[in-house]
Amino acid sequence: KTSSVSFIEKNDKGSWGQWSDFVKAELLITIDAKKDRIVVNSPEIQVFTIKSYGDKIESETTKTVPFDCVDNNGSKCKILVITRKDEKNRMQFYINYSELKFVYNIYN
């Protein structure tokens, strides 16, 4: 489940702007490896087809699980599930497009 969401987008010059303030967003996110699918149950349901599973990346402070995906509109994106070990294992779910990124704070 998520508690909040923030986004960032590229400006006219192609540089990333500033992350928006987090706003409340209580949603259920499901990762279904058997169906190669990730579903974000937002008011407009987002379905991502997993095209490839990346190798888990672990450092002293984070653990990252990457997925290369295609959304229900056919747009490519990279989804990252990041566990912040230095922040009591706080989890975040990133949806990264070339021009736009979303991050959801996750709680169990």
Task: Go through the PLM ranges and name each one.
Residues 26-31, 53-55, 78-83, 104-106:
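Hydrophobic/aromatic beta-strand elements that line small-molecule binding cavities or substrate pockets
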Residues 22-26, 45-48, 76, 99-101:
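Short, mixed charged/polar active-site loops
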Residues 37-39, 43-80:
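Contiguous, well-ordered beta-strand patches that form the walls/edges
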Residues 80-106:
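Short, exposed beta-strand-loop hairpins at the edges of beta-sheets
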Residues 21-24, 31, 60-62, 74, ...:
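Short solvent-exposed loop/turn micro-motifs enriched in small/polar/acidic residues
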Residues 1-45:
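N-terminal secretory signal peptides
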Residues 23, 41-44, 48, 59, ...:
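Mature soluble domains of exported/periplasmic/lumenal proteins and thiol-rich metal-chelating peptides
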Residues 1, 15-17, 57-69, 104-106:
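Flexible, processing/modification-adjacent segments and terminal tails
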